[in-house]
A protein has these predicted regions:
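Conserved Rossmann-fold cofactor-binding substructure of NAD(P)-dependent oxidoreductases
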Residues: 96-111
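Rossmann-fold cofactor-recognition segment
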Residues: 82-99
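Catalytic loop of short-chain dehydrogenase/reductase
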Residues: 122-123, 129-143, 162-211, 223
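Conserved glycine-rich cofactor-binding loop
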Residues: 47
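Conserved glycine-rich Rossmann-like NAD(P)H-binding loop of the short-chain dehydrogenase/reductase
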Residues: 61-76
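Short, flexible catalytic-loop segment of classical short-chain dehydrogenase/reductase
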Residues: 221-231
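C-terminal helical subdomain
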Residues: 211, 218, 233-283
Length: 283
């Protein structure tokens, strides 16, 4: 039954509502809407560079971020940021450790992850990647982290991604993985081959998960001013193939990447795009 209120009662209730001391009663027959939950992203390699910038940009846009890295104790900037931003949760994860991947996936089993962002990667020792110095151990290390680990992460977290609203798996790739641009690349066999393998692996993954409604994004962040980019440019200069494209800041790259992630649809899924140019990359 509804409550009949006189003028005094209405005035009193209005005052209490304004002070936040009472909540407005639900109207008869009108369900109270559930609070909207923020989208959730899990990022690998969140302690520095592009990963840390992605964490900040996503939080700015209202995302909850599960920020992972190998050693949070050494990630002071990330820990300080998380302490000031409740939307950030830090988790320890070495993406080359399958057991650690499965344990973290088990921890979040039953929880939705809108965007699984595979950002962690390495360049490897460039001096060991020249034709005269090739050896299998170094190649296996770079290939495992850059190409295999994102697939392993996708397998482990597929149920959480499939249960989400956005259903996105993102691979942070590189223009170095494009066969089209390979003639201009420096002598960095392991790194370039690993990124080409990542691109193909993600394209095959898209075929596998399309029936679940999952979208797989393959994206280059552009020439970002990070430690990896500095090492890449130094090696390129040594072999006489200097990189002349000006570098951009991690924050600028993160804005482009999040624009790409939020705008990812079926038309771009399984294809290689540049967040720097906003165009598809031939590969």
């Amino acid at each position: 039954m509804g409550v009949v209120m006189n003028g005094y009662t209405r005035l009193l209730l209005s005052g209490l509502l304004a002070l936040g001391l009472v909540q407005a009663p639900a109207q008869t027959g009108e369900p109270v809407p559930a609070p909207v939950q923020p989208p959730v992203a899990l990022i690998t390699g969140s302690d520095r560079g592009i990963g840390f910038a992605l964490t900040q940009e996503l939080v700015t846009r209202g995302w909850k971020v599960i920020a992972t890295c190998r050693d949070p104790a050494r990630a002071q900037a990330l820990r300080d940021y998380a302490a000031a931003h409740p939307l950030v949760v830090i988790e320890t994860l070495d993406v080359t450790d399958n057991t650690a991947i499965d344990q973290l996936a088990g921890k979040y089993h039953g929880q939705s992850i809108d965007a699984l962002i595979n950002n962690a990667g390495i360049t490897g020792d460039f001096a060991a990647q020249r034709l005269s110095a090739l050896e299998p151990e170094g190649f296996q290390q770079v290939l495992r982290l850059n190409a295999y680990a994102p697939l392993r992460m996708a397998r482990a977290f597929l149920e959480s991604v499939s249960a989400s609203r956005q259903k996105k798996i993102i691979a942070i790739s590189s223009g170095a993985g494009s066969l089209f641009t390979a003639p201009q690349a420096p002598d960095s066999y392991y790194y370039d081959m690993s990124k080409a393998a990542l691109n193909l692996g993600m394209r095959l993954l898209q075929n596998d998960v399309r029936g679940r409604g999952v979208l797989v994004g393959i994206v280059s962040p552009g020439p970002v001013d990070t430690d990896m980019q500095k090492a890449y440019r130094a090696n390129a200069a040594q072999v006489g193939k200097p990189v002349t494209m000006p570098a951009i800041t991690p924050a600028d790259s993160a804005r482009g990447l999040v624009n790409y992630i939020e705008g990812l649809g079926a038309d771009k899924a399984g294809r290689f795009w540049s967040a720097y140019t906003g165009q598809e990359v031939p590969w």
